[in-house]
């Protein structure tokens, strides 16, 4: 079970990591999307930071559901509902007492929810191309550093992909050669979580 101080640190680290990478996410999205992913994600996680004390006072499952609600309300675009679904589903599936397998199982359920919401599969140049390999790494017993490394490798692996879902799919072949911004923001979140468990890349 995460104590209140550690839960607060976890939420804050994830939020600040995403906010600090606003420009990078904007640049990635400008190449193959609307160019608003960085600003949208920043707005969502600033709303999370504004509620930090209240969020950290809740049990972990309730915290994650509340974070998801904030992201749905504040992020907008395609990413808001997808990240909101991810966090809310994690909140529904995670027990209060964590171990690697329970996290892997909860992430698997959350991925299924994101897949249904976004009508996407792996290989289509989306956040799923990071989340699915991360879940597999967790399920295989990988430590936090290895999970974070896998997230970053998976985000890089979207560069040669042709987008077939989302705004980037309108570009067809021209989407090749660019990292998917949603994959990158997913990797940032995974890396931030991993760093809170004592190991960073």
Features from the language model and the residues they span:
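N-terminal loops that bind phosphate or other acidic moieties
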Residues: 1-201
């Amino acid at each position: 079970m995460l104590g209140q101080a550690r839960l607060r640190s976890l939420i804050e680290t994830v939020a600040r990591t995403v906010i600090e990478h606003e420009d990078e996410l904007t640049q990635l999205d400008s190449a193959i999307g609307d160019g608003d992913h960085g600003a949208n994600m920043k707005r969502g996680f600033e709303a999370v930071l504004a509620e930090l004390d209240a969020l950290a006072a809740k049990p972990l499952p309730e915290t994650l559901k509340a974070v998801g609600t904030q992201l749905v309300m504040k992020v907008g675009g395609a990413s808001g509902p997808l990240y909101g679904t991810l966090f809310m589903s994690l909140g529904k599936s995670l027990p209060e007492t964590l171990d690697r397998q329970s996290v892997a199982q909860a992430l698997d359920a959350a991925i299924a929810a994101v897949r249904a919401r976004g009508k996407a599969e792996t290989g289509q140049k989306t956040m799923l191309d990071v989340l699915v390999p991360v879940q597999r790494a967790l399920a295989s017993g990988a430590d936090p550093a290895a999970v974070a490394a896998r997230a970053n490798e998976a985000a890089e692996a979207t560069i040669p992909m042709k987008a077939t879902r989302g705004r980037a799919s309108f570009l067809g072949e021209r989407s090749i050669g660019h990292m998917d911004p949603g994959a990158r923001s997913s990797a940032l979140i995974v890396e931030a979580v991993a760093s809170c468990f004592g190991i960073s890349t």
